[in-house]
Structure formats: structure tokens, C-alpha cells
Amino acid sequence: MNTTTLNFNSLMPLIMHSGRLADPLDPASQMLKKLTDKKKKTHSDHLEVSKCEWYGSLYVDDDGKPCLPGEVLEACLVEGARKFKLGKVAKGGLVVLGNFALQFNGPKTADELWENGGYLKRAGVRIGQQRIIRSRPIFPAWACSFEVMWDPGLITDEGQLFDIARSAGQSGIGDWRPKFGRFEVS
């Protein structure tokens, strides 16, 4: 396996949405369930629901700092490879391990980001026939550098890897793509 460093630099804001809230054993999911099970919610209940959704959607590393997980970056690259009809090749030929720091100007911890208020995106989403307001972390300008391992038996060369990454940048990463999460590669 060869290793190459890719740098993603934002063209559009990144909206995060981790799968934590789908896990019924996750503490954030349990807290959200308690709040949403209430029939009559107060204003402060709605604020707590928003906060729970936001924290549950944020990708953080072991130090509590925003990051992009390897599996998210890898899935993004696989999506980019599909433009060249190389989706299955990329699935078998690309590996991104670990969490990679999200680079941005602003507060660095989840609590500071929440308190700042500038990293909150509230928008209506369709669930079945209903429209419900959801809260997500948003990063207006961001970058991420990470290492990708690639199999030279499947990915021809580094040039093909960069073509795949540039294609991924047109599709974007995170929630509500391709409008959000678009990036350029260096």
C-alpha cells in the first residue's frame, strides 16, 4: 500500500451529522429520547433538544475537538470514484484510518462552539410527510489534511487518486451535499 496526504480546503460550509443519535445506547441519544418523549415541551425543552441534536451530530476526537473520521473521508473518496465508474475499485483500494483534525478559525472545543452560536445550523428536514426543525454543526470555512493508503494494484497512480479526490470535492462531504461540504484538493 502506498500513502499520500490529501488536503481538502472548503469551497462551501461543512454540515456535520454523525450517526451517534441512531444508537439507542449512546448517552446523547438517550438524553434526546427523554426530551422528545415529553408531550408538552417548554421553550427550554426545545433549546435542550436543539443542543442534544447538535452535540450528537458533531464529530469529535478523543480530546473533544472537531474532526472528520476516516470512514467519512473514505466514503467521500469512494463517492468521487463513482464518477469514473471506479466505486468498487476505490472501496477495495483506498483506506483512511483514524480521526483527522478539522482546521478552522474559531473556538476549538465542542462546548465553546455551542456557546459561540455561529456554528449552529437549524433547518427544516422532511421526515415522512412531516417537516421538522433539526440542529446541526456547521463550519463556514474549514480544511482537513489526512493520509490515505491506496493499493497500486487497483489505483493506477497518485494522479488517479487526485482525480478521484477532485471529483469527490464536487460532490462534497457531510450533510446536505452537494450544496454544502464542497471542497478543492491540494
Model region roles, listed by residue range:
Residues 1-186:
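RNA-interacting cores
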